[in-house]
């Protein structure tokens, strides 16, 4: 979520490989959203909207929040081009200030491993969720063969994430691996998990 880095990446972000992976992620998230037409979705680290904008026909609204203005510019272009009346973007950097936001469902897709203070961000998102709201996190499974530190990534094990979520106030935590892909993370094979949790 470091703005400058992702500002530089914005125009080259929507590669065929990234689009394909986002469609796989979107399909998995959609399975978690039955009967959600009255729900407001916030995607934290929404980027160019590859995942969040797949959900606009299933929910009341989608708000893409990101700390990269260039990424959000790309997302806004898609929203305008597709005439999506229930989608919008908002610039925000939760590491500096949490904006006044509310949502029934919060999505984080391939964002968690970029966050250094995971516990702090998950606590902030807990306050954004309405009572009964759900947090859906998709990210890479921890693999000791990854050279995380070289690229400044922080990948958590399922147990580590469960503990952080629980301490932040979330309950009904369920984490499951759903996809194994070739060369999907730093040109290495990797698997993806979906973590679901609830704010009671």
Question: What do the PLM-derived regions correspond to, one by one?
Answer:
Residues 1-36, 74:
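Conserved class I S-adenosyl-L-methionine
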Residues 120-131:
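A short glycine-rich, Lys/Arg-flanked "PGG" loop and its adjoining helix->strand segment in the class I
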Residues 107:
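A conserved beta-strand element that flanks and buttresses the S-adenosyl-L-methionine
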Residues 40, 60-61, 86, 134, ...:
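Residues at the starts of beta-strands that form the adenosine-phosphate
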Residues 44-96:
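Class I SAM-dependent methyltransferase SAM/SAH-binding core
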Residues 5, 14-20, 134-194:
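C-terminal alpha-helical "lid/dimerization" subdomain adjacent to the S-adenosyl-L-methionine
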